[in-house]
Amino acid sequence: MNIYSVIKKPLITEKTTIEKDERNIISFVVSSDANKIEIKDAVKTLFNVDVASVKTVNVAGKVKRVGKNIGKRSNWKKAYVTLKEGSNVDFFEA
């Protein structure tokens, strides 16, 4: 898989910002068919950082209703990337 199609976007929330500051863990929304090795290589190449570990979570889409119509949001995959000591990604800085 192409490294530019592995990572879709960073996941920036209050919780992920705290994780970044306290434990040096950054979060990404990644392609559903990407594995941990591809995610690790993509983060290393795109951001020039050393990766310690990668954890992934498959997030199930919620069932939503608008009036009589029932639909389902898409499933997606989230990756928690732990960086080695001294590594930093700049887009999380304000």
Curated annotation (Swiss-Prot):
Name of the protein in question: Large ribosomal subunit protein uL23
Annotated GO biological process: translation
Alphabetically ordered keywords of this record: Ribonucleoprotein, Ribosomal protein, RNA-binding, rRNA-binding
Family annotation (InterPro entries): Nucleotide-bd_a/b_plait_sf, Ribosomal_uL23-like, Ribosomal_uL23/eL15/eS24_sf, Ribosomal_uL23_CS
Superkingdom assignment: Bacteria
Quaternary data: Part of the 50S ribosomal subunit. Contacts protein L29, and trigger factor when it is bound to the ribosome.
Species assigned in the record: Geotalea uraniireducens (strain Rf4)
GO molecular function, one term: rRNA binding
Function according to Swiss-Prot or TrEMBL: One of the early assembly proteins it binds 23S rRNA. One of the proteins that surrounds the polypeptide exit tunnel on the outside of the ribosome. Forms the main docking site for trigger factor binding to the ribosome.
Gene responsible for this protein: rplW
Family, as annotated: Belongs to the universal ribosomal protein uL23 family.
Listed GO CC annotations: ribonucleoprotein complex; ribosome
